[in-house]
Amino acid sequence: MIKDIFFDQVKPAYGCTEPIAVALSTATAKKYLNETLEDLKEINITLDKNTYKNGLVVNIPGTNIFGLEIAAALGYLCGIPEKGLEVLKDVNSQCLSKATNLKNKIKIEINDMPYLYVETIAVSKDNHTVKILIEGKHDNIAKITIDSNTILDKPFNPSKTTLENIKKYSIDEIIDYVENPDKEVLDYVEKAIEMNIDIAKYGMQMKGNFSNAAINEYVKYVSAGVDARMSGVLKPVMTVAGSGNQGLSCILPIATKREEYDKEKILKATLLSILVTIYIKAYTGLLTPICGAGSISAAGSAAGLTYLKGGNRQQIKNAINDTIGTLFGLTCDGAKRGCALKAVTGTLTAIQVSELAINNIDVPCGNGIVAKDVEETIRRVGKLTNSVKQFDKDVLDYIGKC
């Protein structure tokens, strides 16, 4: 059911979700190893290249520090694993001080896994070990092994995830659901709007924030929200398909028009934006070489904005098609403050495309990757995303180096 997919893919998180996945793994390891900092020998972490890429230069929530080692240390020292993606909600200065010392005991390597992969092995000085494996999704703890005793084993199958289930639906069927959604889904959309507007307002007060790059109030919210999140502001963001930046970029362009439209229309348009974003991510994968905030969620917000303005189904599909045709190829070179500017680019395109769609102006099929049927365009995006994965390896040579 679409409702189940929605609740699986729309969750609050503190901080960038890739280092948060690392923090969740070490927090879970601490829960079972139960050793103090003094009695801990080492923590060895293995990551897929995309998780590694997105954790290199993004600030960790509640700190002015970036790096996967500090995320891992904070997770071990003060993370609350039961809170999932909100694992670092209670970070404080005392914990941060200890984490700086723990960094020296943490080693990180990368592998070639094609999906999100976080393996943490914590070892005590008396050689007890706890192994935690997170696979496929930022909060999916797939395996827990204490010494040689496996107490949890849920093998990850990429073809049998909740995200994959959305491929069973067409865009028309998604619009059908948006027209008659479950009440609890709309209530949750309202919560998502309030949460993401809150961090955006905070971001606008930050000195030197990137919202100054925005040319109108609506785009300012997106830029400020992303900037605040990437800067490590200790506030929650409602994520969409594993990404807070996607959540901000597909929710705020519509939510900030609350004064212009009735509440139900805003909620339904926002829901459509969220579901279209999830739909496209099902084909590209959660972690990809393609920018989610600047490209994929822009297609979602273009659909939502077109719906909000009274666009018909074909106009909504054209808006998705045209956004993909315009922005596909905008790459992800890691999570960072500069993502705010990519989100601005995506939001401005979504606004322009929705206006064109309402006026029945669209990119003809056959222009580039744009197909007649929007679902085919999205399938092409998935195939092409897989074809440029070498980028993810090569870009690691440059991130963090001036």
Curated annotation (Swiss-Prot):
Pfam families: SDH_alpha
InterPro entries: Ser_deHydtase-like_asu, UPF0597
GO terms, molecular function: L-cysteine desulfhydrase activity
Membrane-spanning parts: none
One biological process term in Gene Ontology: L-cysteine catabolic process to pyruvate
HAMAP family from the UniProt entry: UPF0597
Similarity section: Belongs to the UPF0597 family.
Name used for this protein in its record: UPF0597 protein THA_1286
Organism of this sequence: Thermosipho africanus (strain TCF52B)
Organism ancestry: Bacteria, Thermotogati, Thermotogota, Thermotogae, Thermotogales
